[in-house]
Amino acid sequence: PDAFDESKPEWKREFEKLKAALTPEEYEAARGSTLNAHYTSPTVIRAIYDALVNLGFEGGRILEPSCGVGNFFGLLPDSMADSQLYGVELDSITGRIAQQLYPDANIEITGFENTKFADGFFDLAVGNVPFGNYQVFDPEYNRLGFSIHNYFACKMLDQVRPGGIVAFVTSRYTMDAKDESARRYLAEGGELL
């Protein structure tokens, strides 16, 4: 966020480079993404995949609904190499980087709420969901009133076939929130492994 803050002289060089390199629309999108764009460390990604391998997951249709530059795709285990990869990324620059890095993946540059994947289409939904105390506008889920992280978790669950797996990083508020509606939704639709 500091590189977007004109009031911080120690970041002036970075600020000027960003302004020069990006269109006004790209600049605003990049600045906005500093609020909730968090990239997952390779250690965490490998641990998630190790758990999936231990559960017997061998591949299939894999969804990463907030894929960033595609780190989950880049660290896909060899045992899952024949999988069909689907990614969604809201940020245009980040999404285009992912498309260049993983040209065989189907990566949509849009919000998860705008995707048209059929429920039950995926064998696995994996990722690091965006965190925040605000809602995403999705007519299918608005009535539930979920925060963005709980929205992602619940929609990921719906997108996975019966017997499929959802594996994701989320904030503590998914399990610790006073409002138990998202936990109930997840418990009714899936099984904690």
Task: Please state what every model-predicted region is.
Residues 1-101:
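Class I S-adenosyl-L-methionine
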Residues 116-126:
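A short acidic, Gly/Pro-enriched loop at the edge of an enzyme's catalytic core
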